[in-house]
Amino acid sequence: MKTFLILALRAIVATTATIAVRVPVPQLQPQNPSQQQPQKQVPLVQQQQFPGQQQPFPPQQPYPQQQPFPSQQPYMQLQPFPQPQLPYPQPQLPYPQPQPFRPQQSYPQPQPQYSQPQQPISQQQQQQQQQQQQQQQILQQILQQQLIPCRDVVLQQHSIAHGSSQVLQQSTYQLVQQFCCQQLWQIPEQSRCQAIHNVVHAIILHQQQQQQQQQQQQQQQPLSQVCFQQSQQQYPSGQGSFQPSQQNPQAQGSVQPQQLPQFEEIRNLALETLPAMCNVYIPPYCTIAPVGIFGTN
């Protein structure tokens, strides 16, 4: 096909060349007959050059020589790549081998060592509890005498609020206030709330006994003497001041749930009077009624 196309192109070029030569010849003869010869020679040379230039078309034959493209077959020789893939699974084998590392067995061994010092810790806790109990007993003995002036102060304020006769005279009342404040300052902050509850509890017991005395038509005594006598009766041996529900058998079951409004009234009065009078901090949880104060009778 290529040879046929080349021959056809040559025929077309030859015909066009002959036509181009024939057309200008009759036009040039009438104008300048002397110049016709060089003009004829120029196109003749050009005509001779056309076939010469057309002849190099056959070098297109080397294109079929490009058939060596099948030389791409050597790419298939690159298949040895799967060969290096074989060693990759080989190093995976040593990874499961380091599993024999079992140092974890040594960890349970030191654990019994930690359990051993836990035993003296329990003994320390017992000692601390014993020390706390001893401190509470000491505080109870101290509170026996410290709560008496504070109780008298609250009784004085309670009697004034209800319009009854005063418990103490004004001169003695000022001294009682000073004693009460000095004693509250010595009480630890953690024990002040319970001390105030004991004061309220003692006041309620005092009121109950006073009502019983009135019912039995006993001789009435001044309230000041009754307070001091009852203070000696309630705290003769240091019992009943700090934990009346446990150490004072007379106080157990004495305050009934029906007396809760009265207890709250006196407690609020004590919380308003004592901290402001003595400039003492009372914890806010002191507004909660202590457990074991109210009996079931």
Curated annotation (Swiss-Prot):
Name of one Pfam family that matches: Gliadin
Q: Give the Pro residues compositional bias ranges.
A: 56-67, 81-101
- Identify the domain of life: Eukaryota
The misc remark on file is: The alpha/beta-gliadins can be divided into 5 homology classes. Sequence divergence between the classes is due to single base substitutions and to duplications or deletions within or near direct repeats. There are more than a 100 copies of the gene for alpha/beta-gliadin per haploid genome.
The signal peptide, as residue positions, is: 1-20
- The question of whether Signal is a record keyword is answered with yes
Which stretches does UniProt call biased (Low complexity)?
29-55, 68-80, 102-127, 234-250
Stated family: Belongs to the gliadin/glutenin family.
Alphabetized SUPFAM superfamilies for the sequence: Bifunctional inhibitor/lipid-transfer protein/seed storage 2S albumin (SSF47699)
Task: Give the Gene Ontology MF terms in alphabetical order.
Answer: nutrient reservoir activity
Fetch the CDD domains from UniProt. Answer: AAI_SS (cd00261)
The segment annotated Disordered runs over 29-127, 234-257
State the UniProt keywords alphabetically: Allergen, Repeat, Seed storage protein, Signal, Storage protein
Q: How is it modified after translation?
A: Substrate of transglutaminase.
Function according to Swiss-Prot or TrEMBL: Gliadin is the major seed storage protein in wheat.
Query: What is the protein's name according to its record?
Result: Alpha/beta-gliadin A-IV
TM stretches of this protein: none
